[in-house]
């Protein structure tokens, strides 16, 4: 294949590309069995070393880009993932994420920029085999929770099936409407050295990854638009439409306008993004257990004191956690009474409870026989040979070859890679197998093909696999054309399907004219019409939006005050003998009052300015980027991001681009630089970018979010937080009388922190007085930064809440604050008492500050109260609030 002119100009033609790739492949072949699967079928080049026709365009594109281009491509993909907020939460094997672990942090999704390209001919084989396998598993599921003929006829051993954790006794008798009992199926496959495909695992409990697959397509298509246009891979988005129609069709027969929800374990789930992104694509609300309740045998969703009927649940919570009454009692992820509602036929849950039994590794041993019995067909996709310890001859083979097999327990889910075990471990395992042979299966080690990856700007080779998806339709099963590809971890970890990155799967179109037309089952209209989608307004969702408003406002205000304090520090650190320099310790004290953390400086006559100079840089550093420092800027940003992820389906896509930039800006895990100038540059950038990001998010919320009850609650949080911050700041800066020069410097800094210095100068022509400041910052209803403006907006927001009577307790409390404020006068607030304090001003500010806290507490205990026994996602008393 001749290199293109542009590729040659780049000095990185196809021949050089292949030479580097062959070197990487040669290194793979050096691995023996103990090290990993080694090199098998090569997706990219044939046995003669020539690029396969399916990959020709990609090879040209990579050669044309060269190393620099591949580096840029990696950077672009990383940036797009960052901007879209695509995350993955790695779960420690020793933790139970489903019962809640608040120490888990989502990390960025890892996506290889180079797609895994599949020819049209290969896809025809995969699609036919995948659909057949879904039909087979559907028939098995219907039989196991129905007539059980495969058990009574002795085809399947009951001891192997019923001991598997995927079997749910409470699911017996539950029947989904329609022809199919298996709603959604995911299948992990790889290619064998002879080019055929092999199934390594089936996922039927709550299949994950379809959201990631469609997000990957969006990222890669944006990263390489020219290549995407040239190859024209078949789209994945029709699968989302097929899934949406199937969910509507799955509703109970009595439902006329079905309401569908996606039930998530929450943001600490391993695949929280996958769930939220899929819910957004489908246009269905993402809910958690706290949002749902069973009443009168029906499932309802909470909505500010009212209930809305739910007809279909797309379940992403494992079955045993779905109902703490009938299943796992300690679950905080399920809905009490959900099993009973299913038995009554008032709600459809998909995948149905009990579908996890199809993930039993022992079942693989019997699939060929089951296919012949239930479908009268031979399997089109084969599985690696499996030996069940419950059959004497197979037990002997298992024990004799335990060191070269993948050993799995059908009871605990434990998986052991035989080649990695020591002699003692192998002996111990043999004893365990002989003691309870029916609990164990041995599987021949899976084999994988290799494909190109972008490794550090160089075309490399790595083992790859695929996860493919189907969804039930009235006339059969519809596959996602493409799926979630993955790059396998090196070494023996690959045998357990451990991955290091994802890959987009590009299926080449056929040459037939109708190649891009989706099959009839996908586009068939549902028997029912789904209800219009609506925003979730349950207490949990509203609480997260409320805290989004608070944390966003807190971060904005904190960034401004930190900027002002840092700038004044640099102005006056060499002018300590001037009266104006007193503004620095006053501002530092204000930071301490607002965050509730000692800033190691005082604002009274006893402070030591030399100590202030020594402490201020480290204090400003920790208040900006130290996540363990109470009230720090990074803490507010983290709180905002956490709340946003909990309501991802409610927010604009632009939110994640802004949040990603802000999170990066305040992420600084190392110690501060020794150089004051370098440290100041880091702080200046972090503070400025955070401020810009918060202003952008405020604009996005105001202009891109529907102003429904969720937006109203977010604005309530914003108004309360701005009022709390303003009263705390003014109390710290203006309640004590100081030298006129110091007072002017303090007033100027305070106005800048309040984003009101320009309007103040325009109104007062440069004259500084506390009376004028209070007039502007407390009483001016046209100033969006004033206290009265916050109270008026807060009153209007409370009135807009559903069920507002006009005289609820929060509304009365706001009215009382408004009355108290309007009875005060700027001139009186400026008056100084005998002890040198502006006592009336301090009393007013302290009183309103306390009242605003009370309003927040009342809202938390009423409109935002979670059901009994539930906790906010931070856990009990974990939200970070400003001190009283």
UniProtKB/Swiss-Prot annotation:
It comes from the Bacteria. Pfam families: Alpha-E, CP_ATPgrasp_1. InterPro entries: ATP-dep_Glu-Cys_Ligase-2, CP_ATPgrasp, DUF403. Coiled coil: none annotated. PANTHER family: BLR2978 PROTEIN, BLR5612 PROTEIN. Gene3D superfamilies: 3.30.1490.270, 3.40.50.11290. It comes from Mycobacterium bovis (strain ATCC BAA-935 / AF2122/97). This is Uncharacterized protein Mb2597. SUPFAM superfamilies: Glutathione synthetase ATP-binding domain-like (SSF56059).
